[in-house]
UniProtKB/Swiss-Prot annotation:
PANTHER family: ATP-BINDING CASSETTE TRANSPORTER. It comes from Arabidopsis thaliana. This is ABC transporter G family member 29. It is found in: Membrane. It comes from the Eukaryota. Expressed in roots and stems, and, to a lower extent, in seedling and inflorescence. The chain crosses the membrane at residues 515-535, 549-569, 597-617, 635-655, 660-680, 747-767, 1160-1180, 1198-1218, 1246-1266, 1273-1293, 1303-1323, 1331-1351, 1385-1405. Induction: Repressed by cold/dark treatment. One of its GO terms (molecular function) is ATP hydrolysis activity. The lineage of its organism: Eukaryota, Viridiplantae, Streptophyta, Embryophyta, Tracheophyta. May be a general defense protein. GO terms for biological process: organic hydroxy compound transport; p-coumaryl alcohol transport; regulation of lignin biosynthetic process. ATP 1 binds at G180, P181, P182, S183, S184, G185, K186, T187. Belongs to the ABC transporter superfamily. ABCG family. PDR (TC 3.A.1.205) subfamily.
Length: 1416
C-alpha cells in the first residue's frame, strides 16, 4: 500500500505542478487554502481521468492517496474500526454524512414503492387420510401426475385460500413490520411481493413496483427475499460467503451515482469528507475479491467476531444458529438491492442483538430511501418502536396496515385494550385469536362477543387509516415519476466472464476445504489398486490360452468398474450443493454454466492424479502389455473414464435432485450401461430391442478401448490360439465379441470424450431448467383450519377444563446441594497455556424444585442452564459430577428417576411418520405401568391431548422440523404431551418457547402452566422471555457465566421480589417503567456490570439471607418425611420385553407404511431392474450351447444381486439415521431396551423384502426361462430373498456403527468394491491367489452367486463348447472345475446366507445398544 501511495503521489505531484493555480471552494464554510497539502491533493485528484478519479481517494491520517480497489484487509479493518466504535450510534452518524453529501448536490436517490392490489392466492391439496404419505397414496399421486400429463384429471383436491383479497402499499424510506400468527400467510405475502411464488399456486390480483408489473422488469434483481431458511455452503467462512454474494450481485447503480456525484461536486467546487469518499468509492468499485461493503455489513450485523469461522452444517461445527440467521440477512444486504422482504430474520437471536440489527437497518432505510418489509417472531417493545408502519395479517387477511402510532387506537375502537405490562407486538398477535381475545376486552358497557378476522378487516376499511389506504390505492402510481435506476431490467448486472471467475475462485476454495474428501478418495483408489494388483498378480497370470485372456479381460473390466464408480462420490457432493445453487440461481447471482463449468475443469487435475496413481500401481503389477505406448494409451482411457463418470453422476444428481431418487434412478441408469457395455452380455448376443443401448453406453467404448489396446499387443498377437487358426489376441477378442480393428481404440477414446462433453452439457441444462423437488411454500395447514372450526364456541373449553387427571401420581420434590460439574479441559484451551486437566462448568449450585411450583432456570449464554438441567435429569453422557441430589429426601437413583421424570428437549425430536395421537399412545403404552389397563391408557392420552390443546391435531402427521407436518409451536406442545403421558412427577423443559412467535409462546406457556396446576414439579430453561411469559413463573434460579447461582427464590407479584433484591445492591440502576424485568435483571447482573460495580454477584448471593433460607430449605427437604419409603420398581422398564417389542413393532410398522419415498423407490427400482434384466437376458435359461451362455447367466445373477442389494443398503440408511435420533431420546427416558427396538426394526423389513423378492423372482424366472421345478424355483427365491435381506441389514448395520449417515455411506461403499471383485464372476474362485481366497469365503455376494448358479445348473448334464478344450464337458463339470462350484453345496450355502443375515442384524442391534454418538 505504501508503494501504491508513493506512485500515486508522484503522478499527482506532476499534475499539481502543472495545475498549481487551480482553486476550489468548499461549501459549508470550508475554504481551500493554497498551502493546504490536503487541498492540493484533492485538486490534483480532480485532474485525473474519470475512471482513475472514481477509484482514487485520500486516506487519513497521513493524507495518503490510494487506489480503493487495492485496499488490504488491515486497511479496511482500520477504517471500519475508526468509523464504527459504537455500531448503532456511529452507523447513524456515518449514514447522515453519506446522505448529506448526496443532498448537497441535489441528487435524487432511486426509490421503489411496492403496491399489491386485491391479491388472492389459493393452493389445491389433499385432505384427510388421502393426504397421509402412505404407500397407496404415494402410488396414486404418481399415477395422477402421469394422467395429468396425458390430459386427464381425476384428482380430487381441496382448495385452500392462503391470502384473501389483500391490498396495500410498502412505501420507501419507511420500515414496515409484518406481524401475524403461524399459518397466517406471512411468508406467502413476502414471496408474492418478491415475485418468487411457486408456479403451482393460483394467483389473482396485481403486484407493481413504481407502477410496473412484475413481468416488465427483473424483480429478482430489483428486490430481495431473505428466507427464514439458512441455506449456505458449510465449509465457507462468514466473510467468504458475503464476499461471494457481493461479487455476484455487483455494484448496481452505485458507480453511476458516484460518477454523477463527483461530476456535480466538481462543478460546484465541493470537496467531500475523506471517510465518506473512501467508503463510496470502495463500494462502487466492482470486480474486487473483498470489498469494504462486506466489512461494513459484518460490523452492523455483529458478525465481525466470527467472520473467519466457517458457517458449518450438520457435519461441520461452525457458527451458532443466530449467527447463521444473520449471515442469511447479510448475504442479501451486501448487494446493491434496496427493496428487501425479510422473513423472520431474528429467529435464534436475543432481543438486544435483534434490536441492534433492526436499528442499523432502520438507519439504512432512512438515509438511503430503501423499501423494507420485515416479519419478526417476538419483537421486544424497543424493537417494535423502530418501525414506521405495521401490517397485521391473520387467516390470510389484512387486519391493519398503516402507521404504528395508530394501531392501538384502531383496536380500542373495536373494544380491545393492550394491558400496561404487555408488549404491543404480543398483544397484536393474540387479539385476533379466539383463544386469547377475550382477556383484552375493555368495553365495560358491552358484553364481550368474539370478533372474527373478517369483521376486523371490515372495520379497518372504515377506520381513517384504512380509508386513506384505499384512497391512495385508487390513484395509480405515475410511472413517469419512477427514477430510471429504480428498477433493474438486466438479469445479470456483472459481466458473464467476471461471474465465471467468481465461481471459479469459489470452486477452487471448496476443493481446498474438501481436501480430506479428495485425499480419502485417493487413498481408496490406492487400496483398491493394491488389492486388484495382488489378486491379478502377474506371477499368477499367464498369456498362453483363451482362459488366460479371459482373466486379463476380467482385470480390465474391474479396472474400468473401479474408475467408473470412483465418480459415485460426485453424486452426494452435487446433491449437497444443490440447495445453495438453487437459491443463488433464483436470486440471479450467476448463470448455471458458471457453476457447472468450473466443477468440470477443476476436476481434471484430480482425475489426472488419481488415474496416474491407479495405472502406476496396477499396470505392471498385474502384467498388462509392457510397451510404454500401450501404458500411456491405457492411462488416457482411465483418465477419460473418470471424467466421463464424474459427468454422468453429476447429471444424475442434477436430474434426480435428492439422494433417494439419485440412488434409485442413478443405479438404474448405471445398471443399464453396465449390463449393455458388452462385457456381461457380448455385443452380438444383446437382444435386438436393446441394441441401441449398447451404442449409447459409455462403458462399451471404455471396454472396447481397453481390451483392443491390450489384446492387440505383440505378446497376444504373436501367440497362436489353441486351435492355431488365428492369433491368441484376436481369438480372445472374438470370444468376447469385441471389435478386432485397432482403430476401435481411438473410436472408443472419441466416444468417451464425446460422452464426457455431452454429460457436462446435460448437467448445465438440468441445472438451468429443473427446480428443487420440494420447493418451500407457505400454506395454511388443514390442521390450523380444523383448529379454527373446532373453536366455534364463544370460549375455548380447554381453558375451563377440569385439571384432575385420570391416573394418580406422587408429587415429588427435588433438592440439590453443592452440585459441581467438570469436563476434560478442551485441547484448544490447553494449547493456549491452560494447565488444569478439568474445566468446571457448574460451581456449588444449590436449590429446590417443588410440586405445583413453576421454576425458571435463567442466565446469559454459557451460564450453564442446560448443563445444570442435564446433570439433574441424568442426561449427561460424559464429564464428572459432584454433589448431593435427592428426590423427596432420598438419594437420586437414575434408573428409578427416569421412570418418574420427563425431559422435553429443545430440538423436538419425534418420529416423523406417525400422527400426534399415535406418538402419545406409543409413549403411554411403553411408559405407564403394565398394571394400567388399555382403556385407562387411552383415556389418559385423550386427557393429556385436551390439557395441551392438541385435540384438533390428533390425526396430523408429525413430519420433519421445518420441512413437513407440524409447526414449531405445535411440535413444542407435542414434546410436552409425549412426556406428560408418562405421568411423571417431575418435568424438565429446555427452552420451550425458543423459535416461537408471541402467540405460540403464550399457548406453550399456558400448556406449561396447566401442567404445573396438576401438582407436578416443572423446571424450564428460558432465554430472553417477554414480560408476561417471565411473570408466569413462580420461582427463579439465576446463574451467571461459570455456573454459579446469583439468585434463587420467588419472583413475586409483578416480579417485585427479584427487583427488590437487585435494587438493594449498591450501584445497581433502578428499573425503568414498563421495562421487562427479565431483560433488566440480565443487564444489571452481566459481567460488564460486575466489573463496573466491582462486585461478584455470586459471592453477594452467598452472603445474603436468601441464600441461608435456601440452605435451610434444602437441609429440611434432604431428610425423608417420617414413614416415607424410597421409590422402588421391581423391573427397569415399565413393560416386559414382549410388551416393548409389540409397541416398537407397532410404531415401526406405521413408519414404514408411511415412508413411500423409501419403499416405493426400492420397489420401483427392483421392478425396473427385473424387467430390464429379463428383457436383456430373454430366455437365457434355455441357451446352453457354449461357455459364453453360462458366463452370461452368471453375469446377470451377479449384476442383479449386486445392484438391487446395494440399492436396498443405500436406501435404508437415511431412514435408520432419522429414527436413531428418536431412539436416543426414548432410550434416555428408559422407555425400552435396545434389543426389542432393534428386533422390531429388523422384523419390519421382512414383509417388504418378501414382496420385493416375490415379484423380482417371478419376473426374472419367467423371462429368463429357468426350469420350472419346485426345488429350483424355491432355491432361487430363497437365495434372492436372503441376499436382499442381508444387504438391507448391512445398510442398517453401517448406520448403527457410525456417527452419521454420510460416514455410513462411505463405510458401506468401501466394501461394495470388494463384494464386486470377490463375487466369483470378475475372477473365478480357482483363479484367486491363495493369499486372498479367505476373503472369497467371507464375501456374502460370492455365496449368493454360488447358490443361484448351483441351484439352476448344479445337476445339468448337458454338454457345452468351451474354447481351448477338445472335448465338450458337461455343465455340471464345467461349473465345478472352472468356477469351483460344488453341486451338493446348497444346504451349506443356505446356512451361510442365513448366518450373514443374522450376523448383520445382530451387529445392527449391537451397535444400537452399545454405541452412543450423541454428545451431551
Amino acid at each position: 500500500m505504501e508503494t501504491l501511495s508513493r506512485s500515486l503521489s508522484k503522478s499527482l505531484g506532476e499534475l499539481l505542478a502543472s495545475n498549481s493555480n487551480n482553486h476550489f471552494s468548499r461549501r459549508s464554510g470550508s475554504t481551500i487554502d493554497d498551502h493546504d497539502e490536503e487541498a492540493l491533493k484533492w485538486a490534483a485528484l480532480e485532474k485525473l481521468p474519470t475512471f482513475a478519479r472514481l477509484r482514487t481517494t485520500i486516506i487519513h491520517p497521513h493524507e495518503d492517496l490510494v487506489d480503493v480497489t487495492k485496499l488490504g484487509v488491515d486497511d479496511r479493518q482500520k477504517f471500519i474500526d475508526s468509523i464504527f466504535k459504537v455500531t448503532e450510534e456511529d452507523n447513524e452518524k456515518f449514514l447522515k454524512k453519506f446522505r448529506n453529501r448526496i443532498d448537497r448536490v441535489r441528487i435524487k436517490l432511486p426509490t421503489v414503492e411496492v403496491r399489491f392490489e386485491k391479491v388472492t392466492i389459493e393452493a389445491n391439496c389433499h385432505i384427510g387420510k388421502r393426504a397421509l404419505p402412505t404407500l397407496p397414496n404415494a402410488a396414486l399421486n404418481i399415477a395422477e401426475r402421469g394422467l395429468r400429463l396425458l390430459g386427464f384429471n381425476f384428482t380430487k383436491t381441496t382448495k385452500v385460500t392462503i391470502l384473501r383479497d389483500v391490498s396495500g402499499i410498502i412505501k420507501p424510506s419507511r420500515m414496515t413490520l409484518l406481524l401475524g400468527p403461524p399459518s397466517s400467510g406471512k411468508t406467502t405475502l413476502l414471496l408474492a411481493l418478491a415475485g418468487k411464488l411457486d408456479q403451482s399456486l393460483k394467483v389473482t390480483g396485481r403486484v407493481t413496483y413504481n407502477g410496473h408489473g412484475l413481468e416488465e422488469f427483473v424483480p429478482q434483481k430489483t428486490s430481495a427475499y431473505i428466507s427464514q431458511n439458512d441455506v449456505h455452503v458449510g465449509v465457507m467462512t462468514v466473510q467468504e460467503t458475503l464476499d461471494f454474494s457481493a461479487r455476484c450481485q455487483g455494484v448496481g447503480t452505485r458507480y453511476d451515482l458516484l460518477s454523477e456525484l463527483v461530476r456535480r461536486e466538481k462543478d460546484a467546487g465541493i470537496l467531500p469528507e475523506p471517510e465518506v469518499d473512501l467508503f463510496m468509492k470502495s463500494i462502487a468499485a466492482g470486480n474486487v475479491k473483498s470489498s469494504l461493503i462486506t466489512d461494513y455489513t459484518l460490523r452492523i450485523l455483529g458478525l465481525d467476531i466470527c467472520k473467519d469461522t466457517v458457517v458449518g452444517d450438520e457435519m461441520i461445527r461452525g457458527i451458532s444458529g443466530g449467527q447463521k440467521k444473520r449471515v442469511t440477512t447479510g448475504e442479501m444486504i451486501v448487494g446493491p438491492t434496496k427493496t428487501l422482504f425479510m422473513d423472520e430474520i431474528s429467529t435464534g437471536l436475543d432481543s438486544s442483538t435483534t434490536y441492534q440489527i433492526v436499528k442499523c437497518l432502520q438507519e439504512i432505510v432512512r438515509f438511503t430511501d430503501a423499501t423494507v418489509l420485515m416479519s419478526l417472531l417476538q419483537p421486544a417493545p424497543e424493537t417494535f418502536e423502530l418501525f414506521d408502519d405495521i401490517i397485521l395479517l391473520s387467516e390470510g387477511q389484512i387486519v391493519y396496515q398503516g402507521p404504528r402510532d395508530h394501531v392501538l387506537t384502531f383496536f380500542e375502537t373495536c373494544g380491545f385494550k393492550c394491558p400496561d405490562r404487555k408488549g404491543t407486538a404480543d398483544f397484536l398477535q393474540e387479539v385476533t385469536s379466539r383463544k386469547d381475545q377475550e382477556q383484552y376486552w375493555a368495553d365495560s358497557k358491552k358484553p364481550y362477543s368474539y370478533i372474527s378476522v373478517s369483521e376486523f378487516s371490515k372495520r379497518f376499511r372504515t377506520f381513517h387509516v384504512g380509508a386513506n389506504l384505499e384512497k391512495d390505492l385508487s390513484v395509480p402510481y405515475d410511472r413517469f415519476k419512477s427514477h430510471p435506476a429504480s428498477l433493474v431490467f438486466k438479469k445479470h448486472s456483472v459481466p458473464k466472464s467476471q461471474l465465471f471467475k467468481v465461481c471459479w475462485d469459489r470452486e477452487l476454495l471448496l476443493m481446498k476445504r474438501n481436501a480430506f474428501f479428495y485425499i480419502t478418495k485417493t487413498v481408496q483408489i490406492i487400496i483398491m489398486a493394491l488389492i486388484a494388483s495382488t489378486v491379478y498378480l502377474r506371477t499368477e497370470m499367464g498369456t498362453k490360452n483363451e482362459s488366460d485372456g479371459a482373466v486379463y479381460i476380467g482385470a480390465l473390466m474391474f479396472s474400468m468398474i473401479v474408475n467408473m464408480f470412483n465418480g459415485f462420490a460426485e453424486l452426494a457432493l452435487m446433491i449437497q450443493r444443490l440447495p445453495v445453487f438453487y437459491k443463488q440461481r433464483d436470486l440471479l447471482f450467476h448463470p448455471p454454466w458458471t457453476f457447472s463449468l468450473p466443477t468440470f475443469l477443476l476436476g481434471i487435475p484430480i482425475s489426472i492424479f488419481e488415474s496416474v496413481v491407479w495405472v502406476t500401481i496396477t499396470y505392471y503389477m498385474i502384467g498388462f502389455a509392457p510397451e510404454l505406448s500401450r501404458f500411456l494409451k491405457h492411462l488416457l482411457v482411465i483418465f477419460l473414464t473418470q471424467q466421463m463418470a464424474g459427468g454422468i453422476f453429476r447429471f444424475i444428481a442434477a436430474t434426480c435432485r435428492s439422494m433417494i431418487l439419485a440412488n434409485t434412478g442413478g443405479a438404474l441408469v448405471i445398471l443399464l450401461l453396465f449390463l449393455l457395455g458388452g462385457f456381461i452380455v457380448p455385443r452380438g448376443e444383446i437382444p435386438k430391442w436393446w441394441k441401441w443401448a449398447y451404442w449409447v453406453s459409455p462403458m462399451a467404448y471404455t471396454y472396447d478401448a481397453l481390451t483392443v489396446n491390450e489384446m492387440l499387443a505383440p505378446r497376444w498377437i504373436n501367440q497362436p490360439s489353441s486351435d492355431n487358426s488365428t492369433s491368441l489376441g484376436l481369438a480372445v477378442l472374438e470370444i468376447f465379441d469385441i471389435f478386432t480393428d485397432p482403430n476401435w481404440y481411438w473410436i472408443g477414446v472419441g466416444g468417451i470424450l464425446g460422452f464426457t462433453v455431452l454429460f457436462n452439457i446435460l448437467v448445465t441444462l438440468a441445472l438451468t431448467f429443473l427446480n428443487p423437488l420440494e420447493k418451500q411454500q407457505a400454506v395454511v395447514s388443514k390442521e390450523n383450519t380444523e383448529e379454527n372450526r373446532a373453536e366455534n364456541g364463544s370460549k375455548s373449553k380447554s381453558i375451563d377444563v377440569k385439571r384432575g387427571m385420570v391416573l394418580p401420581f406422587t408429587p415429588l420434590t427435588m433438592s440439590f446441594d453443592n452440585v459441581n460439574y467438570y469436563v476434560d479441559m478442551p485441547k484448544e484451551m490447553k494449547e493456549q497455556g491452560v494447565s488444569k486437566d478439568k474445566l468446571q462448568l457448574l460451581k456449588e449450585v444449590t436449590g429446590v424444585f417443588r410440586p405445583g411450583v413453576l421454576t425458571a432456570l435463567m442466565g446469559v449464554s454459557g451460564a450453564g442452564k442446560t448443563t445444570l438441567m442435564d446433570v439433574l435429569a441424568g442426561r449427561k453422557t460424559g464429564g464428572y459430577i459432584e454433589g448431593d441430589i435427592r428426590i423427596s429426601g432420598f438419594p437420586k437413583r437414575q434408573e428409578t428417576f427416569a421412570r418418574i421424570s420427563g425431559y422435553c428437549e429443545q430440538n423436538d425430536i419425534h418420529s416423523p411418520q406417525v400422527t400426534v395421537k399415535e406418538s402419545l399412545i406409543y409413549s403411554a403404552f411403553l411408559r405407564l405401568p403394565k398394571e394400567v389397563t388399555k382403556y385407562e391408557k387411552m383415556r389418559f392420552v385423550d386427557e393429556v391431548m385436551e390439557l395441551v390443546e392438541l385435540e384438533s391435531l390428533k390425526d396430523a402427521v408429525v413430519g420433519l422440523p421445518g420441512i413437513t407436518g407440524l409447526s414449531t409451536e405445535q411440535r413444542k406442545r407435542l414434546t410436552i404431551a409425549v412426556e406428560l403421558v408418562a405421568n411423571p412427577s417431575i418435568i424438565f423443559m429446555d427452552e420451550p418457547t425458543s423459535g416461537l412467535d408471541a402467540r405460540a409462546a403464550a399457548i406453550v406457556m399456558r400448556t406449561v402452566r396447566n401442567t404445573v396446576d396438576t401438582g407436578r414439579t416443572v423446571v424450564c430453561t428460558i432465554h430472553q422471555p417477554s414480560i408476561d411469559i417471565f411473570e408466569a413463573f413462580d420461582e427463579l434460579l439465576l446463574l451467571k457465566r461459570g455456573g454459579q447461582v446469583i439468585y434463587a427464590g420467588p419472583l413475586g407479584q409483578n416480579s417485585h421480589k427479584i427487583i427488590e433484591y437487585f435494587q438493594a445492591i449498591h450501584g445497581v440502576p433502578k428499573i425503568k417503567e414498563k421495562y421487562n424485568p427479565a431483560t433488566w435483571m440480565l443487564e444489571v447482573s452481566s459481567m460488564a456490570a460486575e466489573a463496573k460495580l466491582e462486585i461478584d454477584f455470586a459471592e453477594h448471593y452467598k452472603t445474603s439471607s436468601l441464600y441461608q433460607q435456601n440452605k435451610n430449605l434444602v437441609k429440611e427437604l434432604s431428610t425423608p418425611p417420617q414413614g416415607a419409603s424410597d421409590l422402588y420398581f421391581s423391573t427397569r422398564f415399565s413393560q416386559s420385553l414382549l410388551g416393548q417389542f409389540k409397541s416398537c413393532l407397532w410404531k415401526q410398522w406405521i413408519t414404514y407404511w408411511r415412508t413411500p419415498d423409501y419403499n416405493l423407490a426400492r420397489f420401483f427400482f427392483t421392478l425396473a431392474a427385473a424387467v430390464m434384466l429379463g428383457s436383456i437376458f430373454w430366455k437365457v435359461g434355455t441357451k446352453r450351447e457354449n461357455a459364453n451362455d453360462l458366463t452370461k447367466v452368471i453375469g446377470a445373477m451377479y449384476a442383479a444381486v449386486l445392484f438391487v442389494g446395494v440399492n436396498n443398503s443405500s436406501s435404508v440408511q437415511p431412514l435408520i439415521a432419522v429414527e436413531r435420533s428418536v431412539f436416543y431420546r426414548e432410550r434416555a427416558a428408559e422407555m425400552y431396551s435396545a434389543l426389542p427396538y432393534a428386533l422390531a426394526q429388523v422384523v419390519c423389513e421382512i414383509p417388504y423384502v418378501l414382496i420385493q423378492t416375490t415379484y423380482y423372482t417371478l419376473i426374472i424366472y419367467a423371462m429368463m426361462c429357468f426350469e420350472w421345478t419346485l426345488a429350483k424355483f424355491f432355491w432361487f427365491y430363497f437365495v434372492s430373498f436372503m441376499s436382499f435381506l442381508y444387504f438391507t441389514y448391512y445398510g442398517m448395520m453401517t448406520v448403527a456403527l457410525t456417527p452419521n449417515q454420510q460416514v455410513a455411506a462411505v463405510f458401506a461403499g468401501a466394501f461394495y468394491g470388494l463384494f464386486n471383485l470377490f463375487s466369483g464372476f470378475v475372477i473365478p474362485r480357482p483363479r484367486i491367489p491363495k493369499w486372498w481366497i479367505w476373503y472369497y469365503w467371507i464375501c456374502p455376494v460370492a455365496w449368493t452367486v454360488y447358490g443361484l448358479i448351483v441351484s439352476q445348473y448344479g445337476d445339468v448334464e448337458d454338454t457345452i463348447k468351451v474354447p481351448g478344450m477338445a472335448n465338450d464337458p458337461t455343465i455340471k463339470w464345467y461349473i465345478e472345475n472352472h468356477y469351483g462350484y460344488d453341486a451338493d453345496f446348497m444346504i451349506p450355502i443356505a446356512t451361510v446366507l442365513v448366518g450373514f443375515t443374522l450376523f448383520f442384524a445382530f451387529m445392527f442391534a449391537f451397535g444400537i445398544r452399545t454405541l452412543n454418538f450423541q454428545q451431551r
